[in-house]
Amino acid sequence: MLVAAFAAAGEEVEGNPTYPILPHLGELIVGIIFAIIIYAVIAKKVVPRLEAMYEERRAAIEGNVEKAEKAQAEAQVALEQYKAQLADARGEANRIREEARQQGAQILAEMREQAQAESERITTAARATIEAERVQATAQLRAEVGRLATDLAGRIVGESLQDSARQSGVVDRFLADLERSESGASSR
């Protein structure tokens, strides 16, 4: 039947010539039917697959964009944490440096104080030793001067002054008079 329709469409109809540009009615109907069939197949089979592929691609792109934004946000948070940690570390380093400086100054002050105390202790001990030696030397000199004075007086007088109580009294009196005369001379 189709073939007949095609055959009929290609012939002249009652003396009217057919135009090669104008399709025959049978061809037109067959073309429309095939176009509808192709459209239906494309609409039912191809378009949903294309839509699904398009949706998958769009979701993948959006997912990648979201992942990139999320990664960028995480990187920004990590950068902020790093900056905060770096600022904390710098503050801690400054604090430790200042503590070390203060401890160094404190240790230096303590060492100076200890050195000063040691110096004063040594000076005091030296003065005490010198004073003790001076007292001892003075006592020895008094005894020696007394003995020499007694010997000299005994020679001058011609009698022995070996009595120790008497000798001691004479020497002490003589030295006391001598000290008084020196004190009187220095105060003038």
Curated annotation (Swiss-Prot):
Family matches, as CDD domains: ATP-synt_Fo_b
Residues passing through the membrane, by range: 21-41
UniProtKB keywords: ATP synthesis, Cell membrane, CF(0), Hydrogen ion transport, Ion transport, Membrane, Transmembrane, Transmembrane helix, Transport
InterPro entries attached to this UniProt entry: ATP_synth_B-like_membr_sf, ATP_synth_b/b'su_bac/chlpt, ATP_synth_F0_bsu_bac, ATP_synthase_B_chain
Gene3D superfamilies: F1F0 ATP synthase subunit B, membrane domain (1.20.5.620)
Membrane topology (UniProt): Single-pass membrane protein
GO cellular component, one term: plasma membrane
Subunit structure: F-type ATPases have 2 components, F(1) - the catalytic core - and F(0) - the membrane proton channel. F(1) has five subunits: alpha(3), beta(3), gamma(1), delta(1), epsilon(1). F(0) has three main subunits: a(1), b(2) and c(10-14). The alpha and beta chains form an alternating ring which encloses part of the gamma chain. F(1) is attached to F(0) by a central stalk formed by the gamma and epsilon chains, while a peripheral stalk is formed by the delta and b chains.
UniProt protein name: ATP synthase subunit b
Species assigned in the record: Kineococcus radiotolerans (strain ATCC BAA-149 / DSM 14245 / SRS30216)
